[in-house]
Amino acid sequence: MSKFSEKCKELLTENGYNVYRLSQAASLERTTLQRMVTGKRLPGPEFVEQFCQALRISLPEKKEIMDLYKMEAIGETAYRNQTTILHLFEKLSTLEKNKGFNKRSIVDYGEMKLISPISNDKYETELLLQYVLRKTIQEQESPELYTNLPGTDTLLPHYLNLMIPQYGKAILIKHLIHFQTNASYAYENLETLHQIIPLCFSAGINYIPFYYYSKLSRNDRPNLLYPFYIITEKYVLQLASDLSKGILHSDPAILQEYTKEFQNCLEHSSPLLQQSKNLDEALQLYMTSFDTIQDITSLDATPCDSDFMDNEYFFDRVKEHSPEYAPFMNAYKSFLNVINQANRNDFFTINGFQKYCEYGISSGTSSIVIPKFSPEERITSLKYFLEHFSNENHHMLNSTFSYPDSLYIELRNNHSLFLINLADKANISFIIIQESSICNAFSEFFQLLADSEYITPENQTRTLIQKYIRQLKQLTFDITP
């Protein structure tokens, strides 16, 4: 029996029913119910909804049942990967709503004084970490930090985001991360993105992650003696496997040896990503190797530029609004021609789409070169989109899907993942990830997303587009003198 069927059987018994009695009381098909609770066959989602309603279970219990059902339907690994990616989007949405990936500090802790170089509990260990970070950022002109902390750990990102805004300095961080080789544990590799992506998007942090593969699991950590470390110019902080204890070294010979060995480790690892925070450089990186693109999947707040307008219309708008980007247009035109020939699958959010229709604010490339679309331009683009809309290639995500307006994601040929955070021309973070387990997880995620509860039906999407065309026509009629 599966976890899903066991839970269904448990709820059935707890609520005083058996298969026969519940099928009679709730008009549920008895054979389907019997096969569900014995794990012989998985029913459709509507039947599970009716089962939950018939038992009058609580909302937390219903959520548990539906989660177990989805896990059974798509497989535990795919479910964990999907959940991890959705939680990442929720986290990035929350950070965006909080107005940035760095927030000012409202407390000055003053000068910290070291009393003991050894910590014996988590509280003391956090104090040691604070001490090392604060001293490094305060005293170094160009502070650097090297570490092999678990990629999923929140401790270092938490204190960096507290301290960096206080000093107005940029810190270089090189992070050596352990990745799982087993595909069944790929979600652990994905979980590192919860810390990596916000750090990459943070002002004042030059974050460079490296990775290596190992069969070492989380269960092995308790058997390791102080396996984690943080290295700065003047300190080495050794940390226990559960980060509850620490030993601080300041001996120059120890520092030199740790730094040398860390560099050796980097030579046997791989950079996890390419990145840029320069707009011109990011555009050039984005258009690299585009002639090899065959399959492309994108996720953005609004539809792709090429779905809103033809190339000539787009280039005319660039000349009008941002002539400084004209030198890029020949290369970009070739890029768009390749994109239009590729197998495309595009997702966009209903919230971002409504924002565009109501305020003329787009996302992606057009948000760089066209500050705001006029009502007339919006009508033209919506008509063009409606004419070329395909339910197989275009998917509007409903309001239950949490996603930041400033983030654009693109997966090319299932092995190159692009993440672009674009608040405005001055604040861009561009990332390329080509690690196979992460790219494969996103590829599977998009396949599942296209057939999920987050998709707005085609007829509703077309109706919404037509509604906004009518509203914008009325708006232009009202403001015409």
Regions found by a protein language model. Give the residues of each.
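Recognition helix of helix-turn-helix/homeodomain-like DNA-binding domains
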Residues: S27-P43, Q50-Q53, D67-L68
